[in-house]
UniProtKB/Swiss-Prot annotation:
Family matches, as Pfam families: Acb2_Tad1_hairpin (PF24729)
Protein name, per record: Thoeris anti-defense 1
Domains as described in the record: Upon ligand binding the C-terminus changes conformation, enclosing the ligand.
Keyword Zinc appears in the UniProt entry: no
Assembly and oligomerization: Homodimer.
Binding site for 3'cADPR: 52, 54, 76, 80, 85, 90, 107, 111, 118
Superkingdom to which the source organism belongs: Bacteria
Result when mutating residue 111 to A/E: No longer binds 2'cADPR, complete loss of anti-phage activity
Result of changing residue 90 to E: No longer binds 2'cADPR, complete loss of anti-phage activity
Amino acid sequence: MEIKNGLCTQKYTKVYAEDKEKWKFNAPHHFIVGKADCEDEYIEPIEYVNFQEGPIKEYGINGVNNEDLILMVITRLQAFQDSPYKCRENAMAITKLQECLMWLGKRTLDREVKGIEGTSEI
């Protein structure tokens, strides 16, 4: 299925994920970034992104996690900030992405305190 968001342009690329009925653990795990000028049934992949499927303690490490991708984007934007391409918008995006990491880290810490981090327990 194609992933759409009103805040993202799809002028050059489109993002796809498996259909909802194929989701495991309540979320999509497999994404394709494809060229926007292709028909949906003929996606020309640029890159594949596979997220962790299931808790690590139960399934081992089998994909990237949210924090990995956020860290990549922060690193990329920070490199632009250290160049002539520095701008307010990049600085704001970095701040918000760092905030994302903080909240995801808090979720992890809360689960560690409960003794359920890395498991499917709620």
